[in-house]
Each structure stands twice: as C-alpha cells, then as structure tokens.
Amino acid sequence: MKTGSLTQRGALLLLLLLAPAVTPTWYAGSGYSPDESYNEVYAEEVPDTRALDYRVPRWCYTLNIQDGEATCYSPRGGNYHSSLGTRCELSCDRGFRLIGRKSVQCLPSRRWSGTAYCRQMRCHTLPFITSGTYTCTNGMLLDSRCDYSCSSGYHLEGDRSRICMEDGRWSGGEPVCVDIDPPKIRCPHSREKIAEPEKLTARVYWDPPLVKDSADGTITRVTLRGPEPGSHFPEGEHVIRYTAYDRAYNRASCKFIVKVQVRRCPILKPPQHGYLTCSSAGDNYGAICEYHCDGGYERQGTPSRVCQSSRQWSGSPPVCTPMKINVNVNSAAGLLDQFYEKQRLLIVSAPDPSNRYYKMQISMLQQSTCGLDLRHVTIIELVGQPPQEVGRIREQQLSAGIIEELRQFQRLTRSYFNMVLIDKQGIDRERYMEPVTPEEIFTFIDDYLLSNQELARRAEQRDVCE
C-alpha cells in the first residue's frame, strides 16, 4: 500500500508540473482562434462539466453584426452579452436582409449555435422601355425611386415612378411610351395668279409641304385634297389641303388658298342693227370681240376690239349703217366686189315684167323681207329685153353694160324665167327654173350656207320675223 500511494503522488506532481507548459489555443470567452472573424456553427461538443463556468463574462466572443444588431439575454443579467447560455436575437438594419439564424446561443463549446449576416436588399434591374428611359435615385437598392421619361414626341402611359420595396419587388407596373403627337406639317403660302390671256384659268405650281414626325421621324403617308401642282385652276378661290400620317396613325393637316383672278373689261354692247361675237368669256383679258351688222347694213369702223390687261377695250366701237351700193361702176366685177363676204345675192331674171313666174316670185319675196335681211340676202332683178331691159338693186338702176355682164357671168338667159343664188364668196350655189317659196330658199341657206356665227345668231333671232 505504501508503494501505491507513492506512485499516485508522483503522477499528480508530474501533471501539475507539465500543465503550465501547454500553450492555450483560444482566447478567454471567445472560443475562436485570432484569425476567425465571422459567425460559424459547430457541432455541439460535450464539455468537461468541471470546466463550465457561468460566471465568466466572455464565454463566447462578442457578437458584432455588420449592418445589423444582436439583442442578447444572459442568465447573469442584461450587462452580459456573451456569457455561457446567453441567447441573442439577430436583426438587420433597414435595407438589409438577414441570412442565417435569427437566434443564436452561447454554447458550452464557447461557440455560438449558428451564424448569420446582413445582405443588402436589391431589386432586379429594370428593363429599358421602348422610346424611353429611366433614372434612379439609388440604383436598384431599397427605397430607390426610378422615374421614367419618354423620348421627344412620345407620351408616357402608366406609372411614372417605381420604388424598390422591402420584398425585392418594384412597385407599380412597367409603363410604355406611346406616340400620340401628330406630325408637324407646314403648307406653302397661299398664292394669287392672274389668268392667262384669252383664258379663264391659270396654271399654278407650288412646292410640297414640309412634313416632320415629332417621334421617330417616320411619315407613312401624305395625301392631297385638291388639284395637283401644275393644274389649271378656274377663276375663284380654291382650298388645297394636305394631310400627313405617322407610323402610329396620328395625323396632321394644313391648307392654303389658290386664288385665280380674271381681269375683265366692261361688257360691250352690240351695235344697233348688228351683233357681237367674242372669244373666250367675251370680257376677259385677251378676249377678242368682232362686230357684225345685220343684213342690209355694213360696218363703219374697226372690225374687232381686244380686252387689254388694263381692263380696257382697244379701239372704239364701230357702227352699222345702211349698206350703200354704188351702181356707178365700170364693170359687173366692181359691182359684185361690194358684196364680197358681206351679202348673198339672189339674181332674178325674166323675159318681161308680165311674166307669170316673175310676178309670183317677186310677190313672195317682197313679203319675206325680214327673213332675207336676217340671212344677208340682196335681190338683183334683170327683167325685159334690150333696149327696154331693166336692171335694179332696190331702187337703184343698173346700166345696160352691167346688166349684160351679169347675164354672161352668171349664165342667165332672157328667154325664160330663171334665178341663181350666190354665196358671200361669189360662188353660184343654187339655180331655180321656176318660182320657189321663201321657206325653201331659207332652208337651203340655213342648211348649207350659214357660218357658225350666223347659226348662233339665227338661234338668237329665231322668232324675230314672226
């Protein structure tokens, strides 16, 4: 027994001597080596119950949560934050989210029962919107506000601002930029044009309108309402309207006025015993009016007048005077020249004044003087046998020489009744061997001998002789 007691005492003494030589591998109250700087959970160890001491103030290392805080409750009271058995509730500052354990406890192993850290909260990056952009106050972080704006020409529809919320989502919805602005269009200036001479219209040109889209610059269509540039415009005011459409079907219109002015002269009055024929409208710049006289009358003065740009007529008006026939000429040609382009001639030839056909014909013609005058017909009578032969135009007597030449020129015999109708150009147009009614003569003249001007005049005077 004595030997055994000595052996136990020696072993205890050896343990006491060796204990100071062991280097500790932890700091008091931390449970971590000097290089450790974050929370980490280790498997719980079963410590030597003789080593546990709840009185040690720093059994575990002091918790320090960056961007957060630890609220600890110790069995020894509120002033102890890392003693054995202390329980700490972990939380993060606003804008940060706790990753890890919400609650940890200081274990007998001198370690905390878990780890946690605070991660800054972020929302996903917002996509850019078509034809627009956004700016944010603090990037994609919590409470950052992103304000949307659209490119020129577009309007924002939807939420103008979105805020990054605590759940990591953005408030509101994604807006869109809509093109609701119409294009910009500018028409050419209104213009006034003078009608061309002898015309009631004017050709007007202009440049196309200036068109620009306020959004993406794309103009899909430009329509014109009215005549094209270079068209002939009649007298008056004409509205020309253009309409432009952009890609979003917005439209804008503009208009301008084309005014065509016709310079006009005072309306001419027809001469007494005559009439006028005018070109164009009869009173516009460049119009030509010709004076004509009724049958049995001839024009004295200028044959025509022109409407000038000064709005005045050229020359002075002529007059229609009774036609004066000079029978004291040297030849039948000289006599006929007086009727050239003025009068038609109806030459009546008979063997003697008592001829039945002659008397019948002259009687009918004397009753139709108005119709003959309207058709510009002068009657020449050649009656009898030499030396008592008589030739006359109205009341004027023809010489024997003129009578003979007329018979030869027109091949008129003295042997029987015969009659010839001569037009204004001196051409033999119809012969009659027996009396005819004035209506037959008038029908032939109206159908074959009247000019267009005379036809128009006849239409105006259709009922004059009734």
Swiss-Prot record:
Cellular component, GO, one term: excitatory synapse
Keywords: Angiogenesis, Cell adhesion, Cytoplasm, Disulfide bond, Glycoprotein, Proteoglycan, Repeat, Secreted, Signal, Sushi, Synapse
Subcellular location, principal: secreted
Localization, UniProt: Secreted; Cytoplasm; Cell surface; Synapse
GO molecular function, one term: identical protein binding
Domain Sushi residue range list: 70-120, 121-179, 263-322
Protein name: Sushi repeat-containing protein SRPX2
Phylogenetic classification of the source organism: Eukaryota, Metazoa, Chordata, Craniata, Vertebrata
